[in-house]
């Protein structure tokens, strides 16, 4: 989306509590595709070239400010506080100081409209310029317009006023064209007219919509109809879920058009900001979170969950693998049912198999841990083999200790490596060993008790049991009385 070449500022209204969410968290902090609701209108305004963007905060102001600053650290954001939520006009007035000295159009958006596209904002801004109107506003047509302010047009078909539902007559309530809550207003007119807005309405609030009849007299109002899906706000958990599904659907479509195979878009879930390379294949029920990057030709299997993971080209992620803050090099094979925890670094062509957990450890090229192992705080050399059931005992109750396994080393099944410990290159560790001392390169280490085999033990034990049973038989039998016979 090309940025506008003329000055443009924006105000995003994000002060409300959102009581219908029934949450202790401010409404605009609830997430769609991994981002706070307010992130999206702010980002769209930035994409259009708005600078500055003033976010009006109120309920949980510090949390909202922190979330947006973290999500958009380089953006020209300013924050204004609306101490009391007295209406939309009052909220816009709270931004006046932050825009002191600015002259030009001001885009005003609601913080709970995540589905707005930058093209839609551009249409609203451009409509005002083309019509030389003091105000341009977005409208939408709804089959059931309950809860929205109705747009009343004049004889020439231009927006003349907006009537909130609680103040509307029966005839006005029948109107299906409603206010979308998106405006572009000249800054000078905005501050001048807002000072005249009163509270003569059913809610006793300062309505921003009162600006429309004032602007109609001052220089006209341009109306732009926009898709209802984009402009509808999120007010409860049902609408939040719908918005999330639409946003994820848009992301899936963009990936597919860029050469990614998503086998079932309806069962695909990802966050805004995820990257996927061409010819990657994403199987059903995969979840990609945070800043995850999936390389070209990588295949992610059913049920995998990846959060802030970096996967190179040609990686195979088998079903139900969980990856968090880890990186995987080209050609590596993971899973099924493997877990990479923060700090895991899997080298090229390495294998991490089923029920293997890796934390803060690096596997070199071609290293393999194919089954049932825990590798924590470990450095594993290229070509090393980690047998099933191997554990690095990295925690001594006070600190984490490292394990180093050299290139080409072979660790037998069910081995316990008590850190800190180092296994040299090419060394062998016998299955079932518990090791506490270093193993030199090329050596064989055995850390288990010697096997003892007792031939004939089973027969001897059975004979002893039989003799014991005879010695402890019924008292009558021991006294020489005839034993009772069973009828045949």
From Swiss-Prot:
Query: One GO molecular-function annotation for this sequence?
Result: UDP-N-acetylglucosamine diphosphorylase activity
Compartments reported by the entry: Cytoplasm
- Where are the residues of the annotated region Disordered? 459-488
- What function does this protein fulfil? Catalyzes the last two sequential reactions in the de novo biosynthetic pathway for UDP-N-acetylglucosamine (UDP-GlcNAc). The C-terminal domain catalyzes the transfer of acetyl group from acetyl coenzyme A to glucosamine-1-phosphate (GlcN-1-P) to produce N-acetylglucosamine-1-phosphate (GlcNAc-1-P), which is converted into UDP-GlcNAc by the transfer of uridine 5-monophosphate (from uridine 5-triphosphate), a reaction catalyzed by the N-terminal domain.
Is Zinc one of the keywords?
no
Question: Which SUPFAM superfamilies would you find in this protein's record?
Answer: Nucleotide-diphospho-sugar transferases, Trimeric LpxA-like enzymes
Gene name of this polypeptide? glmU
Q: What is this protein called?
A: Bifunctional protein GlmU
User: How is the quaternary structure described?
Assistant: Homotrimer.
Q: Which organism is it from?
A: Anaeromyxobacter dehalogenans (strain 2CP-1 / ATCC BAA-258)
Q: Which reaction does it catalyse?
A: alpha-D-glucosamine 1-phosphate + acetyl-CoA = N-acetyl-alpha-D-glucosamine 1-phosphate + CoA + H(+); N-acetyl-alpha-D-glucosamine 1-phosphate + UTP + H(+) = UDP-N-acetyl-alpha-D-glucosamine + diphosphate
Q: In which pathway does it act?
A: Nucleotide-sugar biosynthesis; UDP-N-acetyl-alpha-D-glucosamine biosynthesis; N-acetyl-alpha-D-glucosamine 1-phosphate from alpha-D-glucosamine 6-phosphate (route II): step 2/2; Nucleotide-sugar biosynthesis; UDP-N-acetyl-alpha-D-glucosamine biosynthesis; UDP-N-acetyl-alpha-D-glucosamine from N-acetyl-alpha-D-glucosamine 1-phosphate: step 1/1; Bacterial outer membrane biogenesis; LPS lipid A biosynthesis
């Amino acid at each position: 989306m090309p940025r506008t070449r003329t000055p443009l500022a924006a105000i995003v209204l994000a002060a409300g509590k959102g009581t219908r969410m029934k949450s202790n968290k401010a409404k605009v902090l609830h997430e769609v595709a991994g981002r706070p609701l307010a992130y999206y209108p702010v980002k769209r305004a930035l994409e259009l070239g708005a600078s500055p963007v003033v976010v009006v905060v109120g309920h949980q102001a510090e949390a909202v400010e922190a979330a947006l600053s973290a999500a958009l650290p380089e953006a020209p954001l300013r924050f204004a506080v609306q101490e009391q939520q007295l209406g939309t006009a009052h909220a816009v007035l709270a931004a006046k100081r932050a825009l002191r000295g600015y002259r030009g159009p001001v885009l005003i958006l609601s913080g709970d409209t995540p589905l707005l596209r930058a093209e839609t904002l551009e249409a609203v801004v451009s409509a005002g310029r083309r019509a030389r109107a003091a105000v341009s506003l977005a409208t939408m047509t709804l089959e059931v317009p309950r809860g929205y302010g109705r747009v009343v047009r004049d004889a020439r078909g231009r927006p003349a006023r907006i009537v909130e539902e609680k103040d509307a007559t029966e005839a006005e309530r029948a109107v299906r064209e409603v206010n979308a809550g998106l405006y572009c207003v000249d800054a000078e007119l905005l501050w001048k007219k807002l000072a005249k807005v009163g509270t003569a309405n059913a809610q006793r609030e300062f309505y921003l919509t009162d600006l429309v009849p004032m602007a109609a007299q001052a220089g006209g109002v341009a109306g732009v109809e926009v898709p209802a899906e984009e402009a509808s706000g999120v007010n409860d958990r049902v609408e939040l879920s719908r918005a999330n599904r639409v946003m994820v659907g848009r992301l899936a479509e963009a990936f597919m058009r860029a050469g990614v195979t998503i086998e079932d878009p309806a069962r695909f879930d990802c966050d805004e900001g995820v990257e996927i390379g061409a010819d990657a294949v994403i199987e059903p029920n995969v979840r990609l979170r945070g800043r995850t990057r999936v390389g070209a030709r990588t295949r992610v299997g059913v049920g995998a969950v990846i959060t802030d993971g970096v996967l190179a080209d040609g990686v195979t992620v088998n079903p139900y693998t969980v990856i968090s803050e880890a990186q995987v090099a080209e050609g590596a094979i993971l899973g099924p049912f493997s877990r990479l925890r923060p700090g895991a670094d899997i080298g090229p062509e390495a294998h991490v198999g089923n029920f293997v957990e890796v934390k803060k450890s690096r596997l070199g090229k071609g290293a393999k841990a194919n089954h049932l192992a825990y590798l924590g705080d470990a450095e594993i050399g290229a070509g090393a083999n980690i047998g099933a059931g191997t554990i690095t005992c990295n925690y001594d109750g006070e600190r984490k200790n490292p394990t180093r396994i050299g290139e080409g080393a072979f660790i037998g099944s069910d081995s316990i490596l008590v850190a800190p410990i180092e296994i040299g290159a090419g060394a062998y560790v016998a299955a079932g060993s518990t090791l506490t001392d270093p193993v030199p390169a090329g050596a064989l280490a055995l850390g288990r008790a010697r096997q003892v085999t007792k031939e004939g033990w089973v027969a001897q034990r059975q004979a002893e049991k039989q003799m014991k049973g005879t010695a402890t038989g019924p008292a009558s039998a021991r006294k020489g009385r005839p034993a009772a016979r069973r009828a045949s």
